[in-house]
């Protein structure tokens, strides 16, 4: 079998994941408004795909052509374009289907040609009061540099200003960052109808109000368009430049980076399309997509529910971990010192972590706090707690990852604010991102320093903790806390030798330990001992690790994979991966936690990790995986994994064809894993 047939291209696997998101929009068992929101998630994901993965492929093609190498990347480009086009056609059909379904529920998303006289008058007033101040046309002249002017991933209206045989062009930015994209209109009879209009169509209706008095014209025509830029940046190293200065400079570079995708309304006149292509320097390698009347469907993630409660998911109230509420504990430190605590979001509330850091900020016994931030919420209470701690005389160290893609600007802001408050802020070395999720609190107790650590799979972010599944381990176990302390020392001195006995730390020992653990399962299988590997990951694309899993399967080791996103491994290849089962789950929460389980001859090893099985996470980032040393917590994670693999509603097979076939239920009972996990955790908390 040729080597290329052993792996699925990661770009195609990623698109297959996004097609699973589109399946959720098509799933009639999902509430109507949630289906509309899944269209927004699909669109947002696709934007990121073009910014990152497509842009990277484009760079590879240009380099390979300059070197005269093979055309594999160009062939892959064609397959990507074909797959995206097919999915976009399905997207358009689903959108129209959902509009009809909303109308049946008395929700009407109307356009500028469907307005009543009363609504027309109301819209002109709305435009003058709320919208006009945000609208400034960009006139397209021979010397206009649109690459410089246009914002990444914003929708624009390209306007024809027609006077006799002369046509001038202008662009209008749709300011959805300043004015809501969805505007409720005054109801008409019957009163139960709830009309809405998109911001795009308000501008279309008010074109006269924008251009009248400045241009003579016979007609104005508007067509939507959007451009996506390459999200990469170069860190140009200068002796005197700090990393923060380099990142600030690089972000400005991203604002004018080359376009990689141009989407336009398919009935836009050819002459206008060509003007825009030329002005945006769209090359033959870029994605040029004729689309519908509307772009930036990512705003549909926040599609409002103006109808009945059953049009959205039934809320699942976040659960408190009852251990923290025990009467014998004066504070969170007492509870954690008594025993390790495991939180699983979004089923558990993130409030416990926020409260622990708040307590640490003023507790007289706390000496020092160290934490690393990768992506935090816009109004982060964690940042506030670190500032309060510094004001209260604690020694506070915050490791800020300035290279967190799409959060760089926010993190530069936080770094400046923390520094001004007297917090010791440190950054990763360029090219070595810190993706671990750690904090360490040092506390004076009975004359000794006791340390409390957090090791997690997700970010310290109040918002995403309501949407992403992630674990937080809170522990005072010195075997773990001492090694978390070493990780922070390694971050501050990345070139000083350091060793770990319990933690798996990238880039120090992760690859070696993972290889050793897979090889141990192979040896156990060959000796007739219990063997098995179970992995829950966002992405599995590192070829070295994929090959190790193939070797395990060939040796008779059962391998169970739950991979949300990219998976280069192909299950069920005869003689290679017969013993590998791979599924993916897409549901109301984004599956984000990473779990590694090794049978280990009957004494299971269970790790929670910040790292996916990607080369960058294993070799080029600081990542941390922790073993669960408490048998009670280990069993809890094993139970949750069992529930996930028993899903008969939202689980799909990962296969060579990228078919996204649902796992058949057969005669098994109906299990929707995320709802079952909620019930499982709720029962645990009630029995504590």
Curated annotation (Swiss-Prot):
Mg(2+) binds at residues 375, 405. The active site is at residue 435. The keyword RNA-binding does not apply. The keyword Phosphoprotein applies. Keywords: ATP-binding, Kinase, Magnesium, Metal-binding, Nucleotide-binding, Phosphoprotein, Transferase. InterPro entries: PLipase_D/transphosphatidylase, PP_kinase, PP_kinase_C_1, PP_kinase_middle, PP_kinase_middle_dom_sf, PPK_C_dom2, PPK_N_dom, PPK_N_dom_sf. An intermediate of this reaction is the autophosphorylated ppk in which a phosphate is covalently linked to a histidine residue through a N-P bond. ATP binds at residues 45, 468, 564, 592. GO terms for cellular component: polyphosphate kinase complex. GO terms for molecular function: ATP binding; metal ion binding; polyphosphate kinase activity. Its cofactor is Mg(2+). Residues 430-464 form the PLD phosphodiesterase domain. It catalyses: [phosphate](n) + ATP = [phosphate](n+1) + ADP. One of its GO terms (biological process) is polyphosphate biosynthetic process. Its EC number is 2.7.4.1. It is an enzyme of class 2 (transferase). Belongs to the polyphosphate kinase 1 (PPK1) family. Catalyzes the reversible transfer of the terminal phosphate of ATP to form a long-chain polyphosphate (polyP). PANTHER family: POLYPHOSPHATE KINASE (PTHR30218:SF0). This is Polyphosphate kinase.
